[in-house]
Amino acid sequence: MPRVVITAEVNDLGTWERGFRTHGDLFKQMGVARMEYATVTGNWVAVCGETTDLDAYMKIFNSPATAEVMAIDGVKPETVRMFVLDKSLDV
């Protein structure tokens, strides 16, 4: 399953996290069963999830509905970066 990592700067970590925790239905539509995330000083967040359908994930991520909830959560859109992990290193 493809693993996707998204990083972004937000206006307020508490506001973002409260909003993020309410978006379970949206994540399910993206083919994600579990989202892992971290926050750091400076109001930066990182979100990671595995999806069963990368096309659906991308379609929903790029939708106006997702842009709306990200704005409500205080995500600064110009800082959003997405990484689809497609390489690995066996050690």
Residue positions per predicted region:
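Short S/T/G/P-rich N-terminal loop/turn motif that feeds into the first structured element of a domain
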Residues: 1-91
